[in-house]
């Protein structure tokens, strides 16, 4: 059963026998005895969690540790802050790899896609399971590039805690703000790691201040650096008043010593640490009443007598309450500060049972899991990553997919180790599992044990909602909590190398869409071409590359275009009648609709009904009407772009007996399109938040270039020796900007983009765009 275990290098001779009742466990033990050393991807990997060294614990404790000992964490940050390098060091010190991976060398564990290894960036979030000092840690490394924001959203949805990694020389950067807001949305406790303390320009004080000012967070300084930039050699543990120094002659950072600070050896450092500890105690006491009472009653006269364990427990409570964030520092590349970071993860971040998942009360002890990622494996088929919130998952278990309203069977259950997977007999609540055999499950789907279990949960949620005067829709949302998919901002056509390869291209795109819901694929009704819609230039480029590498198709991409949207400016009415006879059956529909602009932003049309219609409307007819409205709003009258910020009201509807739902949809769609054409129309263009970090000498040419791109500069900040330009710029004007910026600044500047909103174009720019699209200019 455990053929995949052969990837782990172990000595089978020293594994003692274990009494295991389950027949599956006997198979696992037998497989362990047959293991042969094998090195995947040129790396030395250690054993399955719990099989550290020559000892093997009970199999249940290896696979399913106590829930209090589980930590589901993610690593999040701005691009190039050092997330993947930090992850590699974590895996190495936890005993899960036997050599240090390097992003520049392309041999990291969590960057397992070919494009990731080549580009040195993380595209997909890879889940890794390892042990640290008796704790089970499920860790997800996430991308920092704005084009892959969905990957961050996807993993944050299933995490209990997170490590935010910062470049100590840059502090809070643009994408850091984005992922921090996402973590706020999901109420995820965080700890901060100030990385790259060895880098020229690194400033602990500046980085901490940027967390306080830009993130509006209260930093708890648990460590102080010993030196900065080239002089950085270790950290001081403020809580225990100890210094941690790494051996300069050690190549891997495992060799470090922890010494108590003494007056005779480090008087200045001891004084600074004592002041920092006293400030920390006061700060935590202000945030935690229980700790404040303890300090006032027993340690008010001398904070030095306060035990470190009491302070650590209080910091844990404050972190869970999200009233402050612990701050640590180090250098992942130089192998300093990672072991204390791991200690902080187990000490301060929550276990699954400490997280308040309100929807769990509807399921009690039944299975409830969320599919948060889908991958396609050529041998195994679809691989679905799941976060188990309650119950147990086993191989051959039949499960019910609430979103897809279908029942499937899990054929195999795996423990994820980046792109290496180990087969296991069961997984319980709090864990992250990898399942094989689910062919219809997609990202964001809620998985339960059966349809009856889902109905029972819905009834409990509805009853509770009535007690709290909630709408049914909110109770339903609690049961079907999923992953929010952002709207794409770029699109281009894609064609196969030949007509005979069209089915292969469609299969590849279908698989990629299941893996990445932010990728949208549609058929252009006018040209019949397949259109790819994505989150950015890099996103589309990566998809194109994957089609070539993974599916062997040399597909051709059309020019990249901006995904504009359209809206209307006034209220209009329209009527339409569809009268058609097919065979001996007459289909007759008469519709009157009103289209008007909405006051709030709404990507999907808001659908309303006149009272006289809604009362007697059949459900199938209502679905047909809404399908017709949605279809009409997919293509606006100006550019053929989707319509947004519009409300459609159905004022009258006459349906002849025997009329099919297809004819109802067609009539409603045609009527809505007629109304949209009559209205005053407006093109909306994507407006991006832009942050450019540039040396002072190159500031003027950068500002001049942005002015030509219709940029709106909000402010110019000073960051160390650089200037940071913050503003807005239309997406259409920023295509290919990286090449221009490199030329203007001799390659010294960096920039970050994030979608802000869709703004109305001015009449002149709109006319220019329409003329260009129609071929007049």
From Swiss-Prot:
One of its GO terms (biological process) is ribosome disassembly. Pfam families: EF-G_D2, EFG_C, EFG_III, EFG_IV, GTP_EFTU. It is an enzyme of class 3 (hydrolase). Its EC number is 3.6.5.-. GO terms for molecular function: GTP binding; GTPase activity. The gene is GFM2. The keyword Nucleotide-binding applies. Residues 68-353 form the tr-type G domain. It catalyses: GTP + H2O = GDP + phosphate + H(+). SUPFAM superfamilies: EF-G C-terminal domain-like (SSF54980), P-loop containing nucleoside triphosphate hydrolases (SSF52540), Ribosomal protein S5 domain 2-like (SSF54211), Translation proteins (SSF50447). Signal peptide: none annotated. It comes from the Eukaryota. The keyword Ligase does not apply. SMART domains: EFG_C, EFG_IV. This is Ribosome-releasing factor 2, mitochondrial. Belongs to the TRAFAC class translation factor GTPase superfamily. Classic translation factor GTPase family. EF-G/EF-2 subfamily. This protein may be expected to contain an N-terminal transit peptide but none has been predicted. Mitochondrial GTPase that mediates the disassembly of ribosomes from messenger RNA at the termination of mitochondrial protein biosynthesis. Acts in collaboration with MRRF. GTP hydrolysis follows the ribosome disassembly and probably occurs on the ribosome large subunit. Not involved in the GTP-dependent ribosomal translocation step during translation elongation. Its main location: mitochondrion. InterPro entries: EF-G-like_DII, EFG2, EFG_II, EFG_III, EFG_III/V, EFG_V, EFG_V-like, G_TR_CS. The lineage of its organism: Eukaryota, Metazoa, Chordata, Craniata, Vertebrata. It is found in: Mitochondrion. GO terms for cellular component: mitochondrion. GTP binds at residues 77-84, 141-145, 195-198. It comes from Pongo abelii (Sumatran orangutan).
């Amino acid at each position: 059963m455990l053929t995949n275990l052969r990837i782990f290098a172990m000595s089978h001779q020293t594994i003692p026998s274990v009494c295991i009742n389950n027949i599956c466990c006997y198979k696992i033990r037998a497989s362990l005895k047959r293991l042969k050393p094998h090195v995947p991807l040129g790396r030395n990997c250690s054993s399955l969690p719990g099989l550290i060294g020559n000892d093997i614990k009970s199999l249940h404790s290896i696979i399913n540790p106590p829930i209090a000992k589980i930590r589901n964490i993610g690593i999040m940050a701005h691009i190039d802050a050092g997330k993947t390098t930090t992850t590699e060091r974590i895996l190495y010190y936890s005993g899960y790899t036997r050599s240090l991976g390097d992003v520049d060398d392309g041999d990291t564990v969590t960057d397992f896609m070919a494009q990731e290894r080549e580009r040195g960036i993380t595209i997909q979030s890879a889940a890794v399971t390892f042990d640290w000092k008796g704790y089970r840690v499920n860790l997800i490394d996430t991308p920092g590039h704005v084009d892959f924001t969905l990957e961050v959203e996807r993993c944050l949805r299933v995490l209990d805690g997170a490590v935010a990694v910062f470049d100590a020389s840059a502090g809070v950067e643009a994408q850091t703000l984005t992922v921090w807001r996402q973590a706020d949305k999901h109420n995820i406790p965080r700890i901060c790691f100030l990385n790259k303390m060895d880098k020229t320009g690194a400033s602990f004080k500046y980085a901490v201040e940027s967390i306080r000012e830009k993130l509006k967070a209260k930093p708890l300084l648990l460590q102080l650096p010993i030196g900065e930039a080239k002089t950085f050699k270790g950290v001081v543990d403020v809580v225990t008043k100890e210094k941690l120094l790494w051996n300069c002659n050690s190549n891997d950072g495992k060799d470090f010593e922890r010494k108590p600070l003494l007056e005779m050896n480090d008087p200045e450092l001891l004084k600074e640490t004592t002041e920092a500890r006293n400030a920390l105690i006061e700060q935590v006491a202000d945030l935690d009443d229980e700790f404040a009472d303890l300090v006032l009653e027993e340690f008010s006269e001398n904070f030095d007598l306060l035990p470190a364990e009491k302070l650590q427990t209080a910091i844990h409570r404050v972190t869970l309450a999200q009233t402050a964030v612990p701050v640590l520092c180090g250098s992942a590349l130089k192998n300093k500060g990672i072991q204390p970071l791991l200690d902080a993860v187990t000490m301060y971040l929550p276990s699954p049972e400490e997280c308040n998942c309100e929807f769990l009360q509807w399921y009690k002890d039944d299975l409830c899991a969320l599919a948060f990622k889908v991958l396609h494996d050529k041998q195994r088929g679809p691989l679905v990553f799941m976060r188990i919130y309650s119950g147990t998952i086993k191989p051959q278990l039949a499960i019910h997919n609430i979103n897809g309203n279908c029942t499937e069977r899990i054929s195999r259950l795996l423990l994820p180790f980046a792109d290496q997977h180990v087969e296991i007999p069961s997984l319980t609540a709090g864990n992250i599992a990898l399942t094989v055999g689910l062919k219809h499950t997609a990202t964001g789907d809620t998985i339960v044990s059966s349809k009856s279990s889902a109905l029972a949960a819905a009834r409990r949620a509805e009853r509770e909602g009535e007690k709290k005067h909630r709408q049914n829709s909110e109770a339903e949302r609690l049961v079907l909590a999923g992953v929010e998919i952002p709207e794409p901002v770029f699109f281009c056509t894609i064609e196969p190398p030949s007509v005979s390869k069209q089915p292969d291209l469609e299969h590849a795109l279908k698989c990629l869409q299941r893996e990445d819901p932010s990728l949208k694929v549609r058929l252009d009704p006018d040209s019949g071409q397949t259109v790819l819609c994505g989150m950015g230039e890099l996103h589309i480029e990566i998809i194109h590359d994957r089609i070539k590498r993974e599916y062997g198709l040399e597909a051709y991409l059309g020019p990249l275009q901006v995904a504009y949207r359209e809206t209307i400016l006034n209220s209009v009415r329209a009527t339409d009648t569809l009268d058609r006879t097919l065979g001996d059956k007459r289909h007759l529909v008469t519709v009157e609709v009103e289209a008007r602009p909405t006051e709030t932003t709404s990507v999907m049309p808001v659908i309303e009904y006149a009272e006289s219609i809604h009362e007697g409307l059949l459900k199938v007819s209502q679905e047909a009407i809404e399908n017709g409205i949605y279809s009409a709003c997919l293509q606006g009258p100006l550019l053929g772009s989707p319509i947004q910020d519009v409300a459609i009201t159905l004022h009258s509807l006459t349906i002849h007996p025997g009329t099919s739902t297809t004819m109802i949809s067609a009539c409603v769609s045609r009527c809505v399109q007629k109304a949209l054409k009559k209205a005053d129309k407006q093109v909306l263009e994507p407006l991006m938040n832009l942050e450019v970090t540039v040396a002072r000498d190159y500031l003027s040419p950068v500002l001049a270039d942005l002015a030509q791109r219709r940029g709106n500069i909000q402010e110019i900040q000073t960051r160390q020796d650089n200037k940071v330009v913050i503003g807005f710029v239309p997406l259409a004007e920023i295509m290919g900007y990286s090449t221009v910026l490199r030329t203007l600044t001799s390659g010294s500047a960096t920039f970050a983009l994030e979608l802000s909103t869709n703004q109305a174009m001015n009449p002149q720019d709109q006319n220019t765009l329409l003329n260009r699209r129609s071929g007049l200019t």
